[in-house]
Amino acid sequence: MNFDNLALTDKEIFNIIQLENNRQNNTIELIASENFASKSVMEAMGSQLTNKYAEGYPSKRYYGGCEEVDKIESLAIERLKKIFGCEHANVQPHSGSQANMAVYLSVLEPGDTIMGMNLSHGGHLTHGSPVNFSGRLFNFVAYGVNKETELINYDEVRSLALQHKPKMIVAGASAYSRVIDFKRLKQICDEVGAYFMVDMAHIAGLIAAGYHPSPVPYADFVTTTTHKTLRGPRGGAILCKEKYAKQVDKAIFPGIQGGPLMHVIAAKAVCFGEALKDDYKNYIEQVVKNAKVLEEELKKYDFKLVSGGTDNHLLLIDLTNKDITGKDAEKLLDSIGITVNKNTIPFETKSPFVTSGIRIGTPAVTTRGFKEEEMKEIAYLINYVIENRDSDLSEAKNKVKEICSRHILYK
């Protein structure tokens, strides 16, 4: 990327960006919600479009001079609808959290009952956590996974739905490694007369490429982020049935947002265009393959994987048999250049600031070009540093640098 002007006008920020670039280049990024956007996406993000206010929607703006940004937003909408085959799309949400909030506010009233996945079982803050707006504004009832299988307990979902009669049921997760049965959840929604919303933020790319069943035929509303498996800019989007289009659009603007970020919407359009290409499907195929190899290799080292493995891009590792907390494992791995995040596991006994697990994912390393061989090396390194945590780890640190040197980012 060209930072010639920034290097002259603000050396402090320029230098920190260079340090972050070095960090990304020289570490192995295994945080499941992160990825590396293309140069094209970043160029759109850094364009003159950042200068334009465009409150409203294409052809219905509250500002003049929107002819060109109208074309961009229309392209983003058109491409997103083509990817997922949905009836209506809104590309203005600044984040996945705001996309979720807009859906709730579009058809529900504060205090209404909603069902969502328990955060410690793999759900998300915006699916009813009491510290989040969702849990403060609405009466959330949590469902979770079966204690033995660690898979979503659909019988429990149905039982809770019949008991609490929610106005909406939310599916989707931030740390669930298995296929979600949208058809079954839709049947439960229909049985109790609830709206069905799916937050596909983590698995949107897999759905786009055909590596996870789509929620679009079943859900009234589908929300997503654009920066995880879709490899776009940080932002959100909403898909919905046409009959809810006006309510959703009003919930975003003027409901919870003002002017859309047109430079971000342009970058979203670029990433949607990338997701429509054949090589994107090849990328997602490799993401899934890499996750499966990591699963197999980690099992060889006696790591306990929540639910026994993965069907998607991420794995949740239960570290209780390794006598180390998620917090300590995260710090230890970070010391050699492997970035993961501590994560609660189902039926967690430790604080969310400590945790019994770590979450790892393959989208970012796959974007770099890592394949099966690197996954084997990564699994070896994870095991090595945890087993030898009190030893000198300089050899492992050098190995991480060597692996990274094979696949340079942003050449």
Curated annotation (Swiss-Prot):
Pfam families: SHMT (PF00464)
InterPro entries linked: PyrdxlP-dep_Trfase (IPR015424), PyrdxlP-dep_Trfase_major (IPR015421), PyrdxlP-dep_Trfase_small (IPR015422), Ser_HO-MeTrfase (IPR001085), Ser_HO-MeTrfase-like (IPR049943), Ser_HO-MeTrfase_PLP_BS (IPR019798), SHMT-like_dom (IPR039429)
Location in the cell: Cytoplasm
Superkingdom assignment: Bacteria
Keyword Amino-acid biosynthesis listed: yes
Gene Ontology biological-process entries: glycine biosynthetic process from serine; tetrahydrofolate interconversion
Catalytic activity: (6R)-5,10-methylene-5,6,7,8-tetrahydrofolate + glycine + H2O = (6S)-5,6,7,8-tetrahydrofolate + L-serine
Sequence positions that bind (6S)-5,6,7,8-tetrahydrofolate: L119, G123, H124, L125, S351, P352, F353
Keyword match Amino-acid biosynthesis: yes
Annotated site, Plays an important role in substrate specificity, chain positions: H227
Keyword field: Amino-acid biosynthesis, Cytoplasm, One-carbon metabolism, Pyridoxal phosphate, Transferase
EC number(s) from the headed UniProt entry: 2.1.2.1
Main location: cytoplasm
GO molecular function per UniProt: glycine hydroxymethyltransferase activity; pyridoxal phosphate binding
Span of the signal peptide: none
Enzyme class at the top of the EC tree: transferase
Modification type N6-(pyridoxal phosphate)lysine: residues: K228
Similarity-based family: Belongs to the SHMT family.
Subunit details: Homodimer.
Function, as annotated: Catalyzes the reversible interconversion of serine and glycine with tetrahydrofolate (THF) serving as the one-carbon carrier. This reaction serves as the major source of one-carbon groups required for the biosynthesis of purines, thymidylate, methionine, and other important biomolecules. Also exhibits THF-independent aldolase activity toward beta-hydroxyamino acids, producing glycine and aldehydes, via a retro-aldol mechanism.
Designated name of the protein: Serine hydroxymethyltransferase
Gene name tied to this protein: glyA
